[in-house]
Amino acid sequence: MAEKTQKSVKIAPGAVVCVESEIRGDVTIGPRTVIHPKARIIAEAGPIVIGEGNLIEEQALIINAYPDNITPDTEDPEPKPMIIGTNNVFEVGCYSQAMKMGDNNVIESKAYVGRNVILTSGCIIGACCNLNTFEVIPENTVIYGADCLRRVQTERPQPQTLQLDLLMKILPNYHHLKKTMKGSSTPVKN
């Protein structure tokens, strides 16, 4: 069983994925994406496509799970892909079920983003914020504080290119990495 699930993980050249991370199901990881040890990416209700230049930190959980009212044994639900854009940051211990996410978003530590939330681009979900509504979060929205207050920032968060470069250099020195795909077939950017 473990053999079969590992076969469907596609890692583009240039991505850094630590062996200690847990990746299950049909997952495609784009170039220049860094996945820390102990990060978990689980595709059980459909594939997960992760774009270019994303940073997924320790104990972050990205899961494409079945909705609570559907059990895969009794019904045969249509698999729905989870699409994650470019230059997103998933900080330590965050939980994301968002089925569609644009570019340059930050989900901070211990934040929770539910399945029915669509993040556009440039959004920041603050530490410990719980977002489980049926809505599309407008561009450049910041959600913060215990009451999940909202405001709009004037520009998008900067991509973490320097941090990604450093991690791509440092992580291979201290952790074993999962093998990338051969050839030049990289995932398509949405």
Curated annotation (Swiss-Prot):
Modified residues (Phosphothreonine): 186
Alphabetized UniProt keyword annotations: Centromere, Chromosome, Cytoplasm, Cytoskeleton, Kinetochore, Phosphoprotein
Repeat recorded as keyword: no
One of the record's GO cellular component terms: dynactin complex
GO molecular function: dynein complex binding
Modification after translation: Phosphorylation at Thr-186 by CDK1 during mitotic prometaphase creates a binding site for PLK1 that facilitates its recruitment to kinetochores.
Keyword Membrane recorded: no
Protein name, UniProt field: Dynactin subunit 6
Lineage, top ranks: Eukaryota, Metazoa, Chordata, Craniata, Vertebrata
